[in-house]
Regions:
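Non-catalytic, polymerase-adjacent accessory regions of viral genome-replication enzymes
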Residues: 1-26
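Short, flexible active-site-proximal loops enriched in glycine and acidic residues
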Residues: 12-15, 55-56, 128-132
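Short, conserved non-catalytic motifs in the polymerase core
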Residues: 17-43, 59-76, 136-156
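Internal hydrophobic scaffold segments of catalytic domains
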Residues: 32-52, 110-113, 206
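Active-site-proximal segment of RNA-dependent polymerases
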Residues: 41, 45-103
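Conserved polymerase palm-domain catalytic core
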Residues: 75-177, 181-199, 203-210, 214-215, ...
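PAPS-dependent sulfotransferase catalytic core
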Residues: 225
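Catalytic "initiation/cleavage/transfer" segments centered on a nucleophilic residue
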Residues: 228-229
Length: 237
């Protein structure tokens, strides 16, 4: 998952910031909210959770939500990641010889998702979440704060637009946060990549040029999909 090299956010009451190295270089700044801030963010996103979850198809393996007493929680990372790997293995093993494969990745995904984008997509129901994000922005947090579970939910509200763009082309895909694996005919897959580029530009972000490409064949598809280190922002805890 690509991102711009940035320094730490400014001091933020109710939060601390922690840097971790990214597999492709640079640092990723995680936001660690205090209990009050975490509770506020979760409550702000709570009215949106069911609506966002219902919009997601089975092609989305990560950051699925489940109801819980008094709120919600994210489905366990381990089983979801195992399902991702198993599904990719099955796809690459069973695909016809003429199948075309591709991968795509959103550049600086969380940092590119602005409060205004959430407001535009989710409407008045998102007012509290948008206000929370704007207050974070005033303290130097770009886009969605990386780390808190509610950010993952809001990311899916935006990234589902990429799912829809792919589906309109006839290509098929799986998505793990903003990491996308596509397959289909030699016409469908290039068309899907163009559609992704168009919808990303329209929404205000971009595909990562080094991580978005058509793959040479089934062997490369298997190697790329299953053989690389997990760079997801919701990698295993």
């Amino acid at each position: 998952m690509g991102g711009r090299a940035t320094g730490p956010p400014s001091r933020n009451e109710g939060a601390r910031f922690e840097s971790i190295p990214k597999p492709d270089g640079g640092l990723r700044w995680l936001t660690r909210l205090d209990p009050a801030g975490d509770a506020e963010y979760r409550e702000a996103v709570r009215p949106l959770v069911g609506r966002i979850e219902r919009a997601l198809g089975p092609e989305v393996l990560a950051i699925r939500t489940r109801p819980a007493p008094g709120g919600w929680h994210l489905a366990s990372w381990g089983p979801a990641r195992a399902a991702w790997h198993e599904t990719l293995r099955n796809i690459t093993r069973e695909a016809r010889r003429e199948t075309t494969f591709a991968v795509a990745d959103v550049y600086d995904c969380y940092g590119s998702i602005s409060p205004e984008m959430i407001d535009s997509l989710m409407g008045p129901e998102a007012a509290h979440a948008v206000d929370f994000l704007r207050r974070g922005h005033e303290r130097g947090v770009r886009g969605l704060p990386i780390g808190p579970d509610p950010s993952a939910v809001l990311a899916n509200a935006v990234l589902v637009e990429l799912d829809r763009a792919i589906q309109r082309t006839g290509a098929r895909h799986l998505r793990w946060v903003d990491d996308i694996f596509l397959w289909g005919s030699g016409g469908e897959v290039p068309r899907a990549l163009r559609a992704l580029d168009d919808v990303a530009a329209r929404m205000g972000f971009a595909l990562h040029p080094e991580k978005t490409r058509i793959l040479a064949d089934r062997d490369e598809a298997r190697a790329v999909a299953l053989g690389t280190r997990d760079s997801s922002i919701i990698a295993a805890p």
